[in-house]
A protein has these predicted regions:
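Internal alpha-solenoid helical repeat scaffolds
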Residues: 64-66, 204, 243, 258-261, ...
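Conserved adenine-nucleotide phosphate-binding loops and their immediately adjacent elements
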Residues: 1-27, 112-125, 273-283
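Sensor-1/coupling segment of RecA-like P-loop NTPase cores
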Residues: 168-207, 211-213
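P-loop NTPase Walker A phosphate-binding motif
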Residues: 47-81, 85-88
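Conserved Walker-type P-loop NTP-binding/catalytic site
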Residues: 2-3, 85-152, 201, 223, ...
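Hydrophobic anchor at the beta1->P-loop junction of P-loop NTPases
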Residues: 44
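Helix-coil-helix junctions within alpha-helical repeat/solenoid scaffolds
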Residues: 337, 431, 465, 507, ...
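Short secondary-structure boundary elements
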Residues: 50, 221-229, 233-435, 439-442
């Protein structure tokens, strides 16, 4: 009976789907025709029960019949918080067939980045940039897809896919032009919001064709299905009522007709009035009543299965529901007969454990889960987390259950969630880490631990959401718990977040206030160095008094520790921006190095000082004409961030400043390539931030130097390279580059105004020795405009004019 109904359900869901099946068939034929052809993306959208899964099953059947390899995965309503869950499902056939050394060979340089997210490599310590992991997954799947041509990727219930998978899928969908693969996605309309919704919109846009919206069955199709199921003698009024009751929903229609058969209702007009009651019993509250009618044991078995969501087995459910194996086996059979649970269909290339079960339809799974009393639900999630932990699974795997447990001042749960957050960060899932730490705060943590959880929450969001980081770190510093070095680290990290959020004045005040709390010593010296560092890149706070104070403090430093080395770098940068002797600038910078290299603890990925100090060091070398050392520093930054998996703002700035070094060397083609990469990365982090301005300004400047005026103007228009400008120093100077651009396109008066504003702004800096190689009007500012071909009506800028770019 169950098998027959499953076949009927599948057949019903394909009624009136000829157009969709024809689209699938044509696309598959195109895929198989040419391995060099572009890839395709099909998106099917429809309400629950309209036959999306049946259509994807038919897609699999057609594809396999044509000799295609098919990988498939499915989102789950209770699994949305599990990072990379769906993409791991999707790639399981490929991953289980590869030995570790084969996987490393196929994934190449991306093995250590994508491997932890896919669960085939143990993650390292610390945080990994989620964008880099996403890029690694895109590269990994592209390599695997080329090996398996012709390949079809099927993702069902994408509205319930985890955010990390959706981010990968959106990025992957944008790169199908040179990859012969078919991607088929099915989802419900609505159901999601925030980042997940934006990713789904991007996926639909990447399809390059209208989304296939599935419609309900017409009255004629419903009548045909009714007669095919209950007999040709079903009369027209009865068939019409079936359609009216179900709205033409294929799933509801099949379930209702199954009830008609079970109840032995004759399909005639006189019995049509009974259909609405039968339909209510098939789903929602009626389904719950039907479940309760099977007995308390069967009900608890179904509840436990709904809590698990995936990997449902009789043994595991028995343990979760606290029942014997014999009772659990009997309950499983009852639920199979009642069409609540079923055995999953075997899929080529995947491993299915003996006795594994799944819900017949997601609607049933949702109804069962939502029927669990809240107190019972949270308790069962707690038991499920405990079972996973006891069976050797990590805190990250148990965290989806821990998130559902009712807050109860549980110190152990707080520690488990903190551990899960660390695991999530290590695979590039900061949003999952954030959810764990936010839930830990609700427990709540002990007073002496609370600030530490907030600090960890601030670290979890630093690379992706500076504004959120600021809120958490300010809260952590406002309560007891952070002492000594931890508090200083938190203050410095907060000031970095404020800087990246374009709140530089507040960043300076934050460090200044903390420095006032300490007496003379290494801690105070470090905070003073950080304060000078932020002031040094804040164009509005530069003054002669500040420079004198910095010179006096740096004059006492010999480079004995990193605080002294930082002050030497800051003094060298300040001297360069004020046009002091270039040789003195270089001597200061060289004294900050150890045997010509960055000191331990001052590396590009070391967290104590951050990226800004080393960018100042490299800039000082660049504008003091030690271009070899500047290039070496920025190239080292690129390698360090790439190796560490930091593909956000850090890598963008590394590219931007390496582009600056190339620009100063006259390697304009290399500069343009590097700066375009910097801008692409910066846009992912967010427009308007200082790193975004650095990339845009550098690229416009380089295009002008290459004589590509129209392209420079196009970039400026596209990326908002116009006032209002940020308060931070940007290299090269924004106003100077903008002024040259305006002159180049013939907007002479506006260009002159910008250049005069740049000169006025730079006047306070460019004092002292303007003729020296590092002078404010020279070394720091002397970036020749480059050859710009004369154009009618556009005055040619004077390439010999020295402009203040600081």
């Amino acid at each position: 009976m169950t098998e027959g109904r499953s076949s009927a359900a599948a057949a019903a869901s394909l009624w009136e789907r000829d157009a969709e099946i024809a689209t699938v068939t044509r696309t598959l034929d195109a895929l198989r025709a040419d391995q060099s052809s572009a890839g395709s993306l099909l998106v099917f959208r429809g309400e629950a029960g309209l036959g999306k899964t049946a259509l994807l099953t038919e897609t699999r059947r057609i594809a396999e019949r044509r000799g295609c390899t098919v990988w498939s995965a499915r989102g789950g309503e209770t699994l949305k918080s599990v990072p990379f869950n769906v993409v791991r499902q999707l790639l399981q056939p490929a991953l289980v067939s590869l030995l570790p050394e084969e996987a490393r060979e196929y994934l190449g340089d991306w093995y250590d980045i994508a491997g932890p997210a896919l669960g085939i490599v143990d993650p390292g310590e610390g945080s990994v940039d989620p964008q880099y992991v996403c890029d690694g997954l895109v590269a990994a799947v592209r390599r695997l897809a080329r090996r398996e041509w012709p390949l079809v990727l099927i993702i069902d219930d994408a509205h319930w896919a985890d955010q990390e998978t959706l981010r990968w899928l959106a990025a992957f969908a944008e790169r199908l032009d040179d990859l012969s693969v078919l991607v088929v996605v099915a989802r419900r309309p609505g159901e999601v919001s925030g980042e997940s919704a934006r990713h789904l919109e991007a996926i639909a846009a990447a399809a390059g064709r209208p989304v296939n919206n599935l419609s309900a069955l017409t009255p004629e199709a419903t009548a045909g299905l009714t007669r095919a199921t209950v007999g040709r003698h079903a009369d027209d009024p009865f068939c019409r009522e079936v359609w009216a009751v179900t709205g033409g929903n294929p799933y509801d229609t099949v379930e209702l007709l199954a009830k008609v058969l079970d109840s032995e209702v004759q399909p005639v007009e006189s019995r049509a009035g009974e259909l609405r009651a039968l339909n209510r019993a098939a789903r929602g509250g009626g389904l719950v009543d039907r479940l309760n009618g099977l007995g308390i044991d069967a009900t608890q078995f179904a509840w436990a299965a709904a809590i698990l969501g995936t990997g449902i087995s009789v043994d595991l459910v028995a343990r979760l529901a606290s029942m014997s194996t014999d009772v659990a086996e009997r309950c499983a059979e009852l639920l199979r007969t009642a069409r609540i649970l079923t055995e999953p269909e075997p899929v080529a290339g995947t491993e299915t454990e003996a006795g594994e079960l799944e819900f017949v339809h997601p609607l049933i799974a949702s109804a069962v889960y939502n029927s669990i009393p809240p107190a019972v639900c949270t308790a069962m999630h707690g038991v499920a987390a405990q079972i996973l932990t006891e069976t050797g699974h990590g805190a990250a795997e148990a965290s989806r259950h821990l998130l559902k447990v009712h807050p109860d001042d549980d110190e152990e749960l707080v520690e488990q969630l903190r551990e899960a957050a660390r695991d999530h960060l290590a695979v590039g899932a900061p949003d999952a880490a954030r959810r764990c730490l936010e839930r830990a705060l609700e427990e709540p943590p002990r007073p002496e631990v609370h600030a530490h959880v907030l600090l960890e929450l601030g670290h979890a969001t630093l690379l992706t959401a500076p504004s959120v980081t600021i809120e958490h770190l300010q809260s952590a510093l406002a309560m007891p718990g952070l002492d000594g070095g931890q508090r200083v680290d938190a203050v410095v990290r907060l000031s970095q977040a404020l800087l990246h959020n374009d709140q530089l004045e507040e960043a300076v005040r934050t460090v200044e206030a903390e420095a006032a709390r300490h007496g003379a010593g290494p801690v105070k010296l470090r905070l003073q160095a950080v304060q000078f560092m932020w002031e040094g890149i804040h164009g509005e706070t530069v003054s002669q008094e500040r420079s004198r104070a910095l010179a006096e403090l740096a004059g006492t430093c010999t480079g004995r520790d990193n605080s002294e080395r930082a002050l030497l770098i800051l003094r060298g940068f300040d001297a360069m921006t004020h046009g002091e002797n270039a040789e003195e600038v270089l001597q200061l910078c060289d004294r900050a190095l150890v045997n010509g290299r960055l000191a331990p603890g001052l590396g590009w990925t070391d967290g104590e000082w951050g990226i800004e100090l080393l960018m100042m060091l490299g800039s000082a070398y660049a504008y003091a004409d030690r271009l070899d050392r500047a290039e070496s520093l920025f190239a080292e930054a690129l390698r360090a961030y790439t190796g560490a998996g930091w593909r956000g703002g850090h890598l963008s700035l590394a590219n931007a400043f390496l582009g600056l070094a190339y620009r100063r060397q006259g390697r304009l083609r290399d500069a343009e390539t590097t700066l375009r990469e910097a801008l692409s990365l910066a846009e992912r982090v967010g427009r308007g931030l200082p790193l975004y301005w650095s990339s845009t300004c550098g690229l416009v400047d380089t295009l002008l130097a290459r004589g590509h005026v129209e392209e420079a103007w196009s970039i400026a228009e596209q990326y908002g390279f116009a006032p209002p400008y940020p308060s931070t120093i940007v290299l090269p100077d924004i106003r100077s580059v903008r002024g040259r651009l305006l002159l180049a396109v013939g907007r002479t008066e506006e260009g002159i105004n910008e250049l005069e504003a740049a000169e006025k702004r730079g006047g306070g800096r460019a004092r002292g020795k303007p003729g020296k190689p590092g002078g404010g009007g020279g070394g720091f500012a002397r970036v020749p405009a480059g050859p710009v071909p004369p154009r009618p009506g556009i005055p040619r800028p004077c390439s010999s004019r020295r402009l203040p770019l600081s």
